[in-house]
Amino acid sequence: MGVAQISSAITPAQPAELYPGDIKSVLLTAEQIQARIAELGREIGDNYRDAAAETGQDLLLITVLKGAVIFVTDLARAIPLPTQFEFMAVSSYGSSTSSSGVVRILKDLDRDIQGRDVLIVEDVVDSGLTLSWLLRNLSTRHPRSLRVCTLLRKPDARGAHVDIAYVGFDIPNDFVVGYGLDYDERYRDLSYIGTLDPRVYQQ
């Protein structure tokens, strides 16, 4: 199944919120997210089954903290193969709503990935600058294979010429929060993904 195209948001159906008035609209419901993750899990399992049998090694999921933590947890459960986790923290965001393009490592991997089948798991790819840097960095560590899975992809990412093997949803350029994505460390705990009311980040 192809990438789901999301072109517009809907008004929240349930007004009772953890953050009253902050969410302008719901872009992806919890049900839509989980259904797509189930599809991604099956696709990834099909693609890596032979490699796992050949190497005898589990698929290594490298997760970029913090936004992708909820996604990778659900994704791992949806992949019908054994997986292992590694965490990396890189930063190109401040307290703004756009990527700065300046990348720095906040936390590196705890193990050698040489000879491993590696799947980078991202929450959202917007400019593609951070992901492009990450791919270059990890490729120097000589994994057996290196691919990317992102839950969300924004239009500008297509111009970055970054190969993304698995995409959950193509979304507009809106600044989104929820399901692990934050603004100033808030809203990660929402079960859905929504657009933030501009008044929140224009204060």
Swiss-Prot record:
Entry annotation: catalytic residues: D126
Main location: cytoplasm
Presence of the UniProt keyword Glycosyltransferase in the record: yes
Keywords annotated in UniProt: Cytoplasm, Glycosyltransferase, Magnesium, Metal-binding, Nucleotide-binding, Purine salvage, Transferase
Upper lineage: Bacteria, Bacillati, Actinomycetota, Actinomycetes, Mycobacteriales
GO cellular component terms, semicolon-separated: cytosol
Binding positions (GMP): K154, F175, V176, D182
Binding site for Mg(2+): E122, D123
Family: Belongs to the purine/pyrimidine phosphoribosyltransferase family.
Location of the protein in the cell: Cytoplasm
Protein name as catalogued: Hypoxanthine-guanine phosphoribosyltransferase
A single GO molecular function term of this UniProt record: magnesium ion binding
Species of origin: Mycobacterium avium
Entry binding sites for diphosphate: K66, G67, R188
Biological function: Purine salvage pathway enzyme that catalyzes the transfer of the ribosyl-5-phosphate group from 5-phospho-alpha-D-ribose 1-diphosphate (PRPP) to the N9 position of the 6-oxopurines hypoxanthine and guanine to form the corresponding ribonucleotides IMP (inosine 5'-monophosphate) and GMP (guanosine 5'-monophosphate), with the release of PPi.
Record-level GO BP terms: GMP salvage; guanine salvage; hypoxanthine metabolic process; IMP salvage; purine ribonucleoside salvage
EC number annotated for this UniProt entry: 2.4.2.8
CDD domains (alphabetical): PRTases_typeI
Domain of life: Bacteria
